[in-house]
């Protein structure tokens, strides 16, 4: 049997055949790299093996861990090649499956690097001083004290620089391959002697760091004819150097199949993304509140003048500094004052934060500064950070007085409590004790109990859960700041097992802790689980410090290679219905098709880690063809306290690039696919989070609905398009007013809405024109019998057509009509505009047809039109009803020669404001929707800039988010 004799016993799926076509295209073009992306469970291993078969000859497969190594060996055996594979180089075989670690082990290069760094330091100092290198070296040998400490620090920095050069292959005298340890060098030599022609890099997303540099050096020595990269999650968050390395190793992605496509085709289990929200326990909240008070005390203290010794000028007080910055509007170094509009355009965050602070403190903002709703909000944490950074760097850092230094240190200390660092360059974000408390809160294991109790109620004996944590047990005691608040097991897998075992609802699940160190459970489950694992311990051991007991046989080897398969088999059989493990062991490469519930308790937020963990639940279960997978996050929120939304923001980052069906069946990225109330910035209030938790219970039990939302077997385009989701900001509505009253119309196809919108615009023009006839004309009109009633009805009609918020469907219609008039949107695409209602008052606006580029035009323009643009070129107006002003009030305004309706200005979207003809095209479409309107260019006159400032100061009225939607 040879490599060419390998045969896949199944039938190739459509996307697998497309992957092979991409490979053949690469080979026909003479390319030596093939980069394929497919989700976990989609058969990447068999794809890679088929490419090895097609290429023929000796092959090397590199994998990140032993679990994936075992999968390759098993798959080769299923394809008839059991005798063709080796996992050690102790015998001849044409396919070698090794871990990256086996080839990437480096010797300790410390001595060699230090010697090179010493030589470079000597040469650089000799060049700077004009002395010979020998003289510099001799003098340095006698240095002691501070001089020697400085020299040692400089040499250490040079060592770090040389490490980077060696890793990148840029050092003239030292190659990375020279640093491989003896075993790695021998393996590389053996593989080269065997004539290795094909190298498969499985889970190649790991190669954007040190492994990548080492693998690049190894590949250079092997001189393989073909390199294949396989991954489910190409890394997206890369530095420039990492991106360059990854691109050099693998080249661009040749073929990618998105996870939703494989689910829609029926080859992965349909899944739903769910979340459970909890609040910190009372003791934890008290600790958080104390830190919140400290920050509030800092803010209060900043209102006091800084005392200063005689002869040293005191820095300005904080309010005086902010007032000066807002009034003078120069740089902190005293640069010339600039107009407010220019200042707001250059420093929008500082301008907004400054005005908010002044208004909240009862201080008058400078002339020209906006005073609208968006600026009347009290400063939030982000505003304070902007102001404190400007104050610390501009006022305090330049002042030599001890009092200024003390205040600078006080600001730094208060910020450190919240996880921020005040540096000479500004404020940097980091992980704080507040973050750690929220991620490790004792409320999370209790929430885990609720999640699995809910799932047990819905699934019964078919429940197979996997709970992923960052660590098995605490490696150290709780930090001093959290002593007495968090115990030693906080946030660990051990704590999760104990919580499940202590609750009567979840104890029957028999939670089993699986780590790279051991198998553990509570003493009460030891006998049953030992029997299920087919081990016969001599005695039940005593509980360890965590209160758990270890499961191990009485004799013989016992390693993860032994216990992970047994634990997986016990889960599959239902002897335990919950495995609790670490992300490192079970979060990637672990194959357990029975898993139908995944609970993510980790802090991981990168797209690579999140998608890998989700992949554990997506494989089809041969025993349960109707499997529905539920993936849960547990989030701890105290949003009313400083930094209390840190865990929520982590949750948002997890879901930013994760595609899943929302409650209406649209497959989208972002937290709103969990629930529409979950936005990308701040968490909902506590009452709304309770609503979300109730909705999660219902969705967890609605397996039929979950399957229906996926529409399995229906055709798809496999295209991602941006769409806009909006909801009126509740504070913008008058008492008793609904979203519909405020301007959100029912969702209708454009073919039905367009005539309504056009007629509405015309009616508004007539009504408004009549109402503006003036007091003399109106008085004469009122003398005619019935005319007063007619005028009142017309005014009522005008008010109804001029809501406080711009009509969403009208705004979207204006955008697509403008682009259609400019020839940039085909008519059939423009006519495919729909506004669809979601739950909780949200609406989704999208194009059913067209390219992603067409969708991006609508999404970007609508987001700007309904939001606030800091520096617009053109503004358009619309008449607006003032909430609470009825027909009589409007008539009274007309009699006083004042317009019955107010005027609200909106920024013309940037792309449509690039030239006058484009702005005019939008204005025509806009006027057809909202009625009488005016277009103004605002960047060349003081009046125009003032109008732009006024428009920016008005609250947007809509909460607008843009999401990627797959279809």
Stretches found by the model and what they are:
Residues 2-35:
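Conserved pre-motif I regulatory segment
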Residues 39-42, 94, 124-174, 182-186, ...:
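Conserved C-terminal RecA-like helicase domain
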Residues 40, 46-78, 99-105, 211, ...:
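Conserved Walker A/P-loop ATP-binding site and its immediately adjacent core
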Residues 67-92, 109-118, 247:
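Conserved helix-turn-beta segment of the N-terminal RecA-like "Helicase ATP-binding" lobe
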Residues 72, 107-109, 203-218, 240, ...:
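Conserved ATPase-coupling elements of RecA-like P-loop NTPase cores
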Residues 106, 484-486, 501-506, 513-666, ...:
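Conserved RecA-like P-loop NTPase helicase motor core
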Residues 208-268:
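Post-DEXD/H (motif II) to motif III coupling segment of the RecA-like Helicase ATP-binding lobe
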Residues 296-355, 361, 648-909:
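Long, largely alpha-helical accessory region at the distal end of helicase-like NTP-driven motors
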